[in-house]
A protein has these predicted regions:
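A conserved short beta-strand
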Residues: 75-88
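Conserved HGGG/HGGXW glycine-rich cap/lid loop of the alpha/beta-hydrolase fold
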Residues: 1-48
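Gly/Ala-rich beta-loop-alpha elbow adjacent to hydrolase catalytic centers
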Residues: 59-68
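Aromatic pocket-lining residues of Rossmann-like dinucleotide-binding sites
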Residues: 25, 71-72
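Glycine-rich His-Gly loop
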Residues: 7-11, 61-62, 84
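Active-site signature of alpha/beta-hydrolase-fold catalytic machinery across serine-
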Residues: 20, 70-71
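Helix-rich cap/lid subdomain of alpha/beta-hydrolase
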Residues: 88-140
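Hydrophobic, aromatic-rich cap/lid helix
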Residues: 136-161
Length: 161
């Protein structure tokens, strides 16, 4: 039985966050494929399923599962969600602070502050630990112009969830 893992990072990350998983997968004879949004200097890529894989496992972090195409999901046999969600902005009054924070983040992106926004975001999500404890991401290599646009588009997707 052949197993393929297909991993998708979340908002503001990149595929390098899955590097520690690779040797563990290989030890088990599993193939690990990593999707990449291309926020930084790594080009976007969307791997597909190996036609010989009998087990097709999606591993998605945070927004990651929402970034994968429907046809990929239709062929998956298992899903693993890491700190993910079905909905991001709660309905009604409870969702107002979250929606306001997302609008403020979008304004920073529109003003050209993608790197500063990601630094602040990483500080928040890493807390109470320092952001240096997070896996490497696009900040280390620099945010590309196209990457900043993708960050904005994916941030807008969060508003719809």
């Amino acid at each position: 039985m052949t197993t393929q893992l297909l991993a998708q990072h979340g908002w503001g990350g990149d595929q390098r966050s899955w590097a520690p998983w690779r040797p563990l997968a290989e030890q088990r004879g599993w193939r690990l494929s990593c999707a990449e949004r291309g926020y930084g200097q790594l080009p976007p890529q969307q791997p597909g399923w190996d036609p010989h894989a009998s087990r097709r496992v999606v591993i998605g972090h945070s927004l990651g599962p929402h970034l994968l195409p429907a046809e990929l999901w239709q062929q998956a046999t298992t899903a693993v969600f890491l700190a993910s969600f079905a909905a991001f902005v709660p309905p009604g009054r409870e969702g107002r602070p979250v929606a306001a924070a997302l609008r403020a983040m979008a304004a920073r992106l529109a003003a050209g502050d993608a790197s500063g926004l990601l630094r602040d975001f990483h500080t928040q999500v890493a807390a109470p630990f320092p952001p240096e404890r997070l896996p490497p991401g696009p900040l280390e290599q620099g945010i590309s112009e196209a990457g900043a646009q993708r960050l904005g588009a994916d941030l807008a997707l969060l508003c719809l969830l």
